[in-house]
């Protein structure tokens, strides 16, 4: 019997009708759905309610129902266990999602027949160090961003790669992105589009106050060090636009490729460049 986690975005599936239809399909195919305890209770499936850790660590795969934001959240939770994600789009853009809702059951049939591949996506790891002590760490599938607050002045951030000085960014912030994240915030800030399965790290300043500052692409083996080099800077570090931490003067942020990957289930032979044109045109 397969154990399948089902993670809905309840803001996009408000009445949980989509989730119920997926759970029904799983039960009809001799599978045990693993649901968040609150969601399970709302649906009348208390017996399938599980602790969050059990959902991500014990499921054979996860069905994520939502948009790219849902996938980014699920990806960070799945990564320590390597649990594959089948991403179903209930949003409007869906760069990361594999299928729309009208394709979900045909696609699940394919998965159960073994007609799928698993695509590995590189992730980033960030560690914030204060007074020589690690304070907090993050993982991200898309990007790690240092940005100024709503009313603060221009940020001043010293950047190094493998202890080699790169630049002092006078900007609204700096984006450190994966190839997956190259079509997200980094793209809006003028960064390059990178094929998603290539492994590189992209450094993109946000609105730099200079004539020459451009994105830099470095090796996945490189370690990026960012230093908050001036007092009275209202700066935040955020990961995938979902987790955040306030930074202080002299804080140091180390960013490198994570040892963990996001594993995305693929049932379609989608051409990345077709997807790129379609999704960016939709915007």
UniProtKB/Swiss-Prot annotation:
Superkingdom in the source lineage: Bacteria
Gene name per UniProt: nadK
Binding-site positions, NAD(+): 68-69, 142-143, 153, 172, 183-188, 242
Cofactor(s) needed: a divalent metal cation
E.C. designation(s): 2.7.1.23
Keywords: ATP-binding, Cytoplasm, Kinase, NAD, NADP, Nucleotide-binding, Transferase
GO cellular component, one term: cytoplasm
Protein family: Belongs to the NAD kinase family.
Active site residues according to the UniProt entry: 68 (proton acceptor)
Native species: Thermoanaerobacter pseudethanolicus (strain ATCC 33223 / 39E) (Clostridium thermohydrosulfuricum)
GO terms classed as biological process: NAD metabolic process; NADP biosynthetic process
Name of one Pfam family that matches: NAD_kinase
GO MF entries: ATP binding; metal ion binding; NAD binding; NAD+ kinase activity
Name this polypeptide is given: NAD kinase
Localization annotation: Cytoplasm
InterPro entries: ATP-NAD_kinase_N, ATP-NAD_kinase_PpnK-typ_C, NAD/diacylglycerol_kinase_sf, NADK
Catalytic activity: NAD(+) + ATP = ADP + NADP(+) + H(+)
Function: Involved in the regulation of the intracellular balance of NAD and NADP, and is a key enzyme in the biosynthesis of NADP. Catalyzes specifically the phosphorylation on 2'-hydroxyl of the adenosine moiety of NAD to yield NADP.
HAMAP family referenced in this protein's UniProt entry, alphabetically: NAD_kinase (MF_00361)
Gene3D superfamilies from the UniProt entry: Probable inorganic polyphosphate/atp-NAD kinase, domain 1, Probable inorganic polyphosphate/atp-NAD kinase, domain 2
Broad class of the protein's primary localization: cytoplasm
